[in-house]
């Protein structure tokens, strides 16, 4: 029996080692079982190419509903081109296509069809579903800016395809002599100029025997063109059983002519060929990180998270006839040369999504960084939340982190002068229409060293803490660029502004009034108010650049550890009076049974790694494995809160590898503990890094010892430049904590206070 089990185990390892198809472990439905009241990811199946301009998804929600696909739904209303980064931000430039039989129904309720997940195939590059109501199988395989649909119809004299250009301003034209439909949608949720349009072209391979257009719900047969609030079209034909009708679709934010250029991405490929190319594109990026020695659920969770990390920010540029990048500017409405990416919120993604790109996909991030320079040139500000232009959401000036971390890690924009100019501009201005862009409250902050609690600027303590870290990032770049000493010293001083909010009595961060007094009354369990989607227990740790300074404020490492431990020990009680209701982030904290630790939202996601700064890395190792095991799974309810455009997924990717970028802008990754027995990172420079932990297991999650390229290694961090050199990190795991490793002062990671 033992020999049999060993043989099965060995064979399974061989199968995994040979299967270089990493997409087989990706579940695009992970996190899709979400609602307004409780998020388990708030994702949808994004059928796309990595960072593709357009995603496609089956649509179960009503037109305009941010929850466009939910796993618990049982009807599909259409197949939608989407650019939605989050249900809270919603979509723009969306339109849909839907096969129907029997009657030419345009109404989304009447055309909807029952479906079952057993009849659904979802991969990153291909989607297939059986629509029971119409007896039609729908398949789709996208490129970056185009898609091929294949509809397999039953025998019917009345088979149709509905094209819905959505409401709030749209245009449609049926061109029967060319088997073509063209149109545009202007639908958006904000952040666009007045001339915004998404132009689309749809080409069919079967002549139409029926044609109609729709204006605001009114079906008009043999009318071929509509410009109205809500336009649509229906074309039809006779089909025999099993007949396949194809629809080739391309779109452009620039023009119909550019959409025609984008259609060339499909070439003459059939759907199998496009799916194969999509699979290859995904395997190329997923395969940059190979993990071995885990169980099937761990593989699925890891690669599903890596897939989510490689979707946003998406390309918002197109290629002209000469193959050069060109973009419609969502900031000034002009068509301009160069790169543009969008659909990301830096409040979320500065933390580890962009550091992951810097480490593993720097050439793509180089394009993103150039796009940020273009954003500043076109709007006067770097974005903080872009979808597709500036959106009023969240706090902080974290574009500084995204730009500086990239530059310091060798992902350098061509125009560093404009980069630095834009960073300085952002510290002294706020966007006149979008107050979350730039720095709201900057005059108070620059004068007092904090944004006051009592001057009617919401979430003021959160702003202060993030501005201080952002100033440290600018300080880092100013030093690198050898800026005048006075300038460097200014940002060094402002980087310490976090201290202005520390309350010695509670040993927590607390809102502070303009006259210098602290807010009163003060409840550390109160969500919102002075903080953003969290409370003081969550935000106190937002001193990414200076944990030692925070340790000193709390009275030393012992008290710091006690306060950290308390986050898990304090019951999941809360004060929701600021919101007047239990917001979903609160509920996600309470249901996870981990005290007041709220991993479902970003402010606290780095906190566990701070144990390393206080000389108790084994506590980080314990809690990290707890979070990975209890709060992630490759299932529709697989996240413990909003996935947030790759951030919560990238946290898992880094943590499963055994390190994490607590402070973007430094060259350090803080060591946790690997999840897999082996991981291999293939860098763009041609080097590979192997992380080998052969005795890793469910019970052996503590790091007993570590060596790097054969040399004993006790530090609690790894350096970026050393990782890129490749080599081997050997980790001996244990079921007992080693309380002697990583405890010496020289083992501690970077803190700004130590440099002063």
Question: What do the predicted segments below correspond to?
Answer:
Residues 702:
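Extracellular attachment/recognition segments
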Residues 470:
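ATP-dependent phospho-/nucleotidyl transfer catalytic cores
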Residues 1-20:
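Bacterial Sec-dependent N-terminal signal peptides
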Residues 20-354, 358-401, 407-465, 473, ...:
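Accessory carbohydrate-recognition regions in carbohydrate-active enzymes
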């Amino acid at each position: 029996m033992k020999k049999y089990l060993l043989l099965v185990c060995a064979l399974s390892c061989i199968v995994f080692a040979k299967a270089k198809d990493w997409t087989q472990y990706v579940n695009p439905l992970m996190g899709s079982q979400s609602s307004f009241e409780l998020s388990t990811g708030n994702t949808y199946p994004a059928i796309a190419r990595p960072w593709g301009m357009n995603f496609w998804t089956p649509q179960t929600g009503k037109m305009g509903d941010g929850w466009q696909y939910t796993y618990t739904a049982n009807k599909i209303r259409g197949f939608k081109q989407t650019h939605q980064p989050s249900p809270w931000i919603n979509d723009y430039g969306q339109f849909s296509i839907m096969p129907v039989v029997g009657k030419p129904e345009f109404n989304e309720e009447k055309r909807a069809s029952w479906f079952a997940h057993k009849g659904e195939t979802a991969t990153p590059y291909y989607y297939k579903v059986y629509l029971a109501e119409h007896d039609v199988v729908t398949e789709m395989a996208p490129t970056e800016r185009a898609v091929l649909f294949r509809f397999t119809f039953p025998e019917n004299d009345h088979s149709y395809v509905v094209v819905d250009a959505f409401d709030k301003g749209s245009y449609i034209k049926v061109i029967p002599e060319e088997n073509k439909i063209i149109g545009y949608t202007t639908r958006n949720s904000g952040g666009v100029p007045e001339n915004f349009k998404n132009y689309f072209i749809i080409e069919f391979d079967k002549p139409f025997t029926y044609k109609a257009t729709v204006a605001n719900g009114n079906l008009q047969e043999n009318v071929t063109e509509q410009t109205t609030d809500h336009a649509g079209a229906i074309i039809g034909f006779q089909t025999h059983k099993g007949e396949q009708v194809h629809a080739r679709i391309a779109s452009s934010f620039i023009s119909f002519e550019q959409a025609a250029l984008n259609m060339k991405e499909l070439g003459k490929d059939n759907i199998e060929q496009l799916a194969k190319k999509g699979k290859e594109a995904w395997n190329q990026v997923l395969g940059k990180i190979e993990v071995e020695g885990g169980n099937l659920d761990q593989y699925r969770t890891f690669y599903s998270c890596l897939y989510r990390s490689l979707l946003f920010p998406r390309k918002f540029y197109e290629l002209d006839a000469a193959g050069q990048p060109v973009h419609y500017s969502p900031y000034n409405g002009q068509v301009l040369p160069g790169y543009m990416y969008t659909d990301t919120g830096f409040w979320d993604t500065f933390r580890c999504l962009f550091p992951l790109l810097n480490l593993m996909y720097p050439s793509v991030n180089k394009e993103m960084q150039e796009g940020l320079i273009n954003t500043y040139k076109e709007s006067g500000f770097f974005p903080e939340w872009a979808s597709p232009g500036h959106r009023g959401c969240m706090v902080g000036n974290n574009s500084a982190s995204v730009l500086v971390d990239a530059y310091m890690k060798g992902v350098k924009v061509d125009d560093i002068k404009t980069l630095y100019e834009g960073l300085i501009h952002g510290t002294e201005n706020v966007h006149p229409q979008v107050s979350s862009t730039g720095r709201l409250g900057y005059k108070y902050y620059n004068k007092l060293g904090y944004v006051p609690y009592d001057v009617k600027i919401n979430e003021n303590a959160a702003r202060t803490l993030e501005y201080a870290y952002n100033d440290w990032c600018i300080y880092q770049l100013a030093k690198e660029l050898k800026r005048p000493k006075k300038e460097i010293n200014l940002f060094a001083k402002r980087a310490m502004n976090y201290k202005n909010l520390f309350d010695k009595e509670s040993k927590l961060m607390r809102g502070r009034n303009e006259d210098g007094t602290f807010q009163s009354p003060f409840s550390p369990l109160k969500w919102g108010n002075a903080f953003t989607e969290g409370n003081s227990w969550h935000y106190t740790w937002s001193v990414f650049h200076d944990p030692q300074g925070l340790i000193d404020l709390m009275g030393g490492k012992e008290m710091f550890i006690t306060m950290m431990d308390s986050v898990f020990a304090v019951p999941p009680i809360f004060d929701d009076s600021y919101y007047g209701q239990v917001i979903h982030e609160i509920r996600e904290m309470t249901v996870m049974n981990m005290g007041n630790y709220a991993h479902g939202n970003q402010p606290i996601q780095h906190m566990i790694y701070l144990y390393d700064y206080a000389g108790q890395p084994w506590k980080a190792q314990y809690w990290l494995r707890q979070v990975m095991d209890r709060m992630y799974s490759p299932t529709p309810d697989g996240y413990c809160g909003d996935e947030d455009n790759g951030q919560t997924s990238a946290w898992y990717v880094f943590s499963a590898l055994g390190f994490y970028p607590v402070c973007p802008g430094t060259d350090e990754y803080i060591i946790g503990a690997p999840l897999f027995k082996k991981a291999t990172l293939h860098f763009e420079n041609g080097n590979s890094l192997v992380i080998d932990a052969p005795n890793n297991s469910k019970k052996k999650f503590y790091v007993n010892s570590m060596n790097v390229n054969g040399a004993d290694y006790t530090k609690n961090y790894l350096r970026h430049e050393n990782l890129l050199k490749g080599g081997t990190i050997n980790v001996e795991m244990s079921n007992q904590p080693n309380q002697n490793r990583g405890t010496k002062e020289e083992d501690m990671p970077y803190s700004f206070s130590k440099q002063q």
